[in-house]
């Protein structure tokens, strides 16, 4: 009952999925030219808003997600709270290990530390969350302008989370909801993805949102 309509984007020609009777409406979008992550979700949002009865909430979902219990009921409760910009679940691996989906602000120094000495503990400050599973109030996603489509892949989730917080919205962690996400880490393995990642980081670090967020970001209190 939590899901009203699902939009499936076919970013390149592929066989259609086997028809199944779902308890919600399923609609497909077919791109003539492959688009980036943010552009695809913005397109789905525009189509949803054009429906006769558009949903009050909009979920961004990766195709490699799974779950054993419906995560949407607790996510909807969290996203309906005052000042909620988006709600997100706990992400775990197929072996039930907690993913590092909550991150601190990426800087050249922090990324170097991450690759030289990986630390998978929860960061002292959560500045952004990966966009594998996010639930937005539709009015918030619309007013914030959705994803910045200049980010073809990578960092569009960082940019969106920073812009949400600059507008006074909160990133709502929802411990009652859990999804399984097998992160591909393609930028660690494929040169093309690595170049996309580097280009997106360069764009992020030179963006107005990044500069504004760093200026207003207060130092963490040491315990």
Language model features by range: what are they?
Residues 40-41, 69-74, 157:
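Acidic donor-diphosphate engagement hotspot in glycosyltransferases and nucleotidyltransferases
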Residues 159-223:
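Active-site-adjacent helix/loop segment of glycosyltransferases
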Residues 54-66:
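Short beta-strand-to-loop acidic/aromatic patch adjacent to the donor-nucleotide binding site
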Residues 32-50:
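Glycine-rich, basic loop-to-helix element that forms the pyrophosphate-binding segment
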Residues 65-100:
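Conserved donor NDP-sugar-binding/catalytic core segment of glycosyltransferases
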Residues 128-145, 150-178:
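A short, conserved alpha-helix in the catalytic core of glycosyltransferases
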Residues 1-33, 51:
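Acidic donor-binding segment of Leloir-type glycosyltransferases
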Residues 105-127, 131:
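Short, flexible, basic/aromatic active-site loop/helix in glycosyltransferases
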């Amino acid at each position: 009952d939590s899901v009203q309509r699902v939009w499936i984007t076919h970013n390149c020609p592929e066989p259609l999925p086997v028809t199944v009777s779902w308890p919600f409406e399923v609609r497909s979008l077919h791109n003539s030219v492959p688009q980036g992550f943010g552009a695809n979700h913005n397109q789905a949002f525009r189509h949803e808003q054009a429906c006769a009865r558009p949903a009050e909430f909009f979920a961004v979902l990766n195709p490699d997600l799974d779950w054993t219990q419906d995560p949407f009921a607790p996510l909807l409760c969290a996203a309906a709270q005052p000042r909620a910009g988006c709600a997100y679940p706990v992400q775990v691996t197929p072996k039930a290990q907690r993913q590092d989906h909550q991150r601190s602000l990426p800087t050249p120094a922090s990324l170097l530390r991450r690759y030289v000495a990986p630390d998978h503990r929860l960061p002292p400050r959560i500045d952004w969350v990966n966009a594998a599973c996010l639930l937005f109030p539709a009015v918030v996603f619309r007013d914030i302008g959705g994803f910045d489509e200049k980010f073809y892949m990578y960092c569009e989730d960082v940019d969106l989370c920073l812009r949400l917080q600059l507008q006074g919205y909160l990133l709502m962690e929802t411990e009652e909801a859990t999804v399984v996400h097998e992160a591909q880490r393609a930028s660690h393995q494929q040169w093309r993805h690595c170049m996309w990642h580097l280009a997106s980081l360069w764009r992020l670090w030179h963006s107005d949102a990044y500069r504004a967020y760093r200026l207003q970001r207060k130092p963490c209190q040491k315990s």
